[in-house]
């Protein structure tokens, strides 16, 4: 890595729902596209159309009407490596237009993922893409870098997995990390179910994307759920309409806050788990009593599923009810939190002190994929 100065590392945050990719040192990702691989449902009859057997990302999204869409990552864990390779290939060659064999690559991963997952990631980077060096970083830790803190508890909630990671003076506290397999995709599925009950049919993988868009545009989190329900029954202030691609208009009211309420009450979808506010509290309680005060004062939200309006207030109120009454609770919701994992990766990969942390190809050739557990936290 002697000539590392003139080579920009690549940062690729492979989310369950979206891939965020770009160059270290930039302040935002260059490429953001859905982690989707689509395959045609029908046989092609017109010759010379240049039809492909698989489409990736935005192209798959735009042709979704004729494709079966598959997400290769589920709950933050790669379930289909062939499709994942397609996504990485698309990221490097089509989106960023770089040769991966010329750049170190920083990848991200959810905490408490199976060890085999990061080993396979390492193997593909070195053997398929021939990268000179790579590193796998924990997503929530990167979000804390992006917020400019060294102490705090990060609630990172994306499309596939949510987790709380307490960090004190730069040290992650692994015994207190909690993972909740409840995130954006579960909310989308729940909204699909609610809409089906109301007589709208959303069943295919392509229609799920419409519901996801509806969720992102219209859903919000009520500060007091029961009271908001009463308001919705009597007044029309909550009503919003959404136009489907075919021009049909749907009106949704109470469903706007019923859908993301699942984050705080997972029992809505039959999950026997604590809500995100309680998970954060449980995570803090697993930490040493001396550092809890600092964690309560620095609850940092990150990831796309924390973008709902009203989430910070509700989070503060939820923890206020659980924590000691005199405790000062501060919830930080940075406006760029949708991309804060990527931004943190960009910061980390461009630090001069980080340059000796990369796993070099030579080290990989010597030790094999298991090197990733020794070099990456």
Curated annotation (Swiss-Prot):
Protein's cellular compartments: Cytoplasm, Cytoskeleton
GO CC terms of this entry: cytoplasm; cytoskeleton
Keywords of the record: ATP-binding, Cytoplasm, Cytoskeleton, Hydrolase, Nucleotide-binding
Keyword Protein biosynthesis among UniProt keywords: no
Enzyme class, first EC level, given as a word: hydrolase
Family designation: Belongs to the actin family.
Disulfide bond sites: none
Catalytic function, reaction form: ATP + H2O = ADP + phosphate + H(+)
Pfam families: Actin
Main location: cytoplasm
Domain of life: Eukaryota
SUPFAM superfamilies xrefs: Actin-like ATPase domain
UniProt protein name: Actin-1
GO molecular function (one): hydrolase activity
E.C. no: 3.6.4.-
Function according to Swiss-Prot or TrEMBL: Actins are highly conserved proteins that are involved in various types of cell motility and are ubiquitously expressed in all eukaryotic cells.
PANTHER family tied to this protein: ACTIN (PTHR11937)
Upper taxonomic lineage: Eukaryota, Viridiplantae, Streptophyta, Embryophyta, Tracheophyta
Xref: InterPro entries: Actin (IPR004000), Actin/actin-like_CS (IPR020902), Actin_CS (IPR004001), ATPase_NBD (IPR043129)
